[in-house]
């Protein structure tokens, strides 16, 4: 009789970094955190953990405060960015709570030290948590102003030796144009890093893309609003758009 272990699908990746936007936590709201959406995201993460995948996350803070927007309104850019970093800590703590409620051991590591609520970011400790099966949520971006949480995600993914960076969005990949505004827009199945930069495609900011390109870290852009999509990507299903170093023919 085959064992349950034998029936478990084999994931394509051992260690992943999942990048979530702050807006992903809002659900249908216009601000803040939707408990229902938070629970759904936690469930998707648990599905990956149950497959034996080591999961790290980086979360934005745009559902609470966006540094660039604050700077546009006349606020000092550094101050605005630090406020945005603090917003990511709130989101990280919320997701940690949602994960631990469903039995997933989780640690939050903040690039800005605040010992009462999170561990400081220590690369070796983060890797050790992952090896022990804990989920690690990286908060406060890089800890420096002028750097996006996309860049922080790329940096952390490389530091922990992630196999892939999963960029969660509200659309099912990268398109030639905004599919919500232009019905004729077509989706890319694959893109090279250079194509993303040359065509100025809104995958991630250019610093984040360049970091991934320089270190051969593949990026998969996919729709995270559909329950189970994170698991599908981890199992190697061809959904979304893959950004990488395409082989020349």
Curated annotation (Swiss-Prot):
Gene3D superfamilies attached to this UniProt entry: Acetylglutamate kinase-like (3.40.1160.10)
GO cellular component: cytoplasm
GO BP terms in the entry: 'de novo' CTP biosynthetic process; UDP biosynthetic process
Signal peptide: none
Activity-regulation annotation: Inhibited by UTP.
Enzyme class (EC, first level): transferase
Residue sites binding UMP per the record: 61, 81, 142-149
Location of the protein in the cell: Cytoplasm
Catalytic activity: UMP + ATP = UDP + ADP
Any Pfam family matching the protein: AA_kinase
Keyword Kinase (UniProt): yes
Pathway(s): Pyrimidine metabolism; CTP biosynthesis via de novo pathway; UDP from UMP (UMPK route): step 1/1
E.C. designation(s): 2.7.4.22
InterPro entries recorded: AceGlu_kinase-like_sf, Asp/Glu/Uridylate_kinase, Uridylate_kinase, Uridylate_kinase_bac
List of residues binding ATP: 19-22, 62, 66, 169, 175, 178
Chief location of this protein within or outside the cell: cytoplasm
Quaternary assembly: Homohexamer.
Family designation: Belongs to the UMP kinase family.
Described function: Catalyzes the reversible phosphorylation of UMP to UDP.
Protein name in UniProt: Uridylate kinase
Organism, as annotated: Anaeromyxobacter sp. (strain Fw109-5)
